[in-house]
Curated annotation (Swiss-Prot):
Keywords: Cytoplasmic vesicle, Endoplasmic reticulum, Golgi apparatus, Membrane, Sugar transport, Transmembrane, Transmembrane helix, Transport. Residues 1-36, 89-107, 154-161, 221-242, 296-303, 349-381 are cytoplasmic. The keyword Endoplasmic reticulum applies. It comes from the Eukaryota. It is found in: Golgi apparatus membrane; Cytoplasmic vesicle membrane; Endoplasmic reticulum membrane. The chain crosses the membrane at residues 37-57, 68-88, 108-126, 131-153, 162-184, 200-220, 243-263, 275-295, 304-324, 328-348. Residues 58-67, 127-130, 185-199, 264-274, 325-327 are lumenal. Homooligomer. It comes from Phaeosphaeria nodorum (strain SN15 / ATCC MYA-4574 / FGSC 10173) (Glume blotch fungus). GO terms for biological process: GDP-mannose transmembrane transport. This is GDP-mannose transporter. Residues 1-12 have a biased composition (Basic and acidic residues).
Length: 381
């Protein structure tokens, strides 16, 4: 473009008495198109919270059956549903992930074993404990992961993070105390029903301790292995679920009772279709959690995502009070509140820690993939 042409662009011609100019067209501002639903941060956050609640409630519904004991079979059904769902999505061109590779499967197989340990112990803990207590105690996994990062990845724990850990421990103590007091007040101090309720709770706490250790080990190991395999979101989901199917199926056949009498107990005729449908929905919810987690990470900031992870504990705990008639006492509500505050304090502490300028190599805050985040959040439920 020449200089004369540029000057013409900024020149204003004065109208001549001998000539007339046509009126200039009225310039209207361009209308902005409304943002699509997939770019809406609020929709992503609500979908993420809803999928977390859906998975917790459906699992609790199946596991809270009086005689349900086919936990390996439940996990196998969930894995089959998940692999089927993402395979259909890949065939439809909605998502992409790597094709099965034997060498990659061998590298990832130990992670799948740890995943089985984490989910299996979690099912027994969720069976014996109420959803609010389970959610509160799940916070203790964060403490183990934090100190695991200190040992394995050279991480650090700030004073504010340490304060949030103290609140997490306090909320767990309050929840256990409230649970025990409710059992004693409901059934009497020395009654057989009270002793049975206490033994059930103690079994739940023991399974919860195993679950916290397994969860921390799984997540730390997966973080290390993802760096070696360079897996993306759906790669991790695909291999995690595909490799666990044969293990869970064999474990169910060898360990669990498949007699006709036990099948009748696990799937009573009047509830059989409902239980099977809920098992399938719980498998689909794992896909929903992974997708909505990745969606929330994409359309929100890391700060918002961290805060959503903390705030998500409250509706999950409340869902246990609403859907499963968990005891609503001063102690249980206080435990939920303290656990909720501890999550917020922890999220703020991590945001502040990550916002500090890094003067050394970034070995302390290597981000997890969205799939590992979604798996960790779904099991905090």
């Amino acid at each position: 473009m020449s200089d004369d042409k540029k000057s013409d662009d900024y020149r204003v011609d004065m109208p001549s008495s001998r000539t007339s100019r046509a009126p200039s067209p009225i310039m209207r501002p361009a209308l902005k198109s409304a943002p699509s639903l997939t770019e809406n941060p609020m929709a992503a956050v609500l979908a993420y919270c809803a999928s977390s609640i859906l998975m917790t409630v459906t699992n609790k519904y199946v596991l809270s059956g009086v005689d349900f004991n086919l936990n390996f079979f439940l996990l196998c059904v969930q894995s089959v549903v998940c692999v089927t769902a993402i395979s259909i999505c890949k065939a439809a061109g909605l998502i992409t992930y790597r094709d099965f590779n034997t060498d990659e499967a061998k590298k990832w197989f130990p992670i799948s074993l740890l995943l089985i340990g984490m989910i299996y112990t979690g099912t027994w803990a969720l069976k014996y404990l109420s959803i609010p207590v389970y959610t509160i105690f799940k916070n203790l996994t964060i403490i183990l992961i934090a100190y695991g990062e200190v040992l394995w990845f050279g991480g650090s724990v700030t004073p504010m993070t340490l304060f949030s850990f103290g609140l997490m421990v306090l909320s767990s103590i309050i929840a256990a105390w409230a649970d025990i007091q409710h059992a004693l007040n409901s059934f009497g101090q020395q009654s057989e029903a009270a002793n049975e309720a206490l033994s059930t709770m103690h079994a739940g706490y023991l399974w919860m301790a195993f679950n916290c250790v397994c969860s921390a080990t799984y997540l730390l190991s997966m973080r290390k292995r993802i760096k070696l395999t360079n897996f993306k979101d759906y790669d991790t989901m695909y291999y995690n679920n595909l490799l666990t199917i044969p293990i869970l199926l064999v474990a169910s056949i060898l360990v669990e009772d498949w007699s006709s009498a036990n099948i009748q107990k696990n799937f009573p005729p009047e509830q059989r279709n409902t239980v099977i449908m809920v098992m399938v929905i719980s498998g689909m919810s794992t896909v929903f959690i992974s997708y909505t987690s990745a969606w929330a990470v994409r359309v929100t900031s890391s700060t918002t995502y961290s805060m959503v992870g903390a705030l998500n504990k409250l509706p999950i705990a409340i869902s246990g009070l609403v859907f499963f008639d968990a005891p609503v006492t001063f102690g249980s509500v206080s435990a939920i509140f303290v656990g909720f505050v501890s999550g917020i304090v922890y999220a703020v502490a991590k945001v502040r820690q990550n916002s500090k300028p890094k003067t050394v190599l970034p070995t302390t805050n290597i981000p997890l993939s969205a799939s590992s985040r979604s798996m960790q959040d779904s099991l905090k439920a």
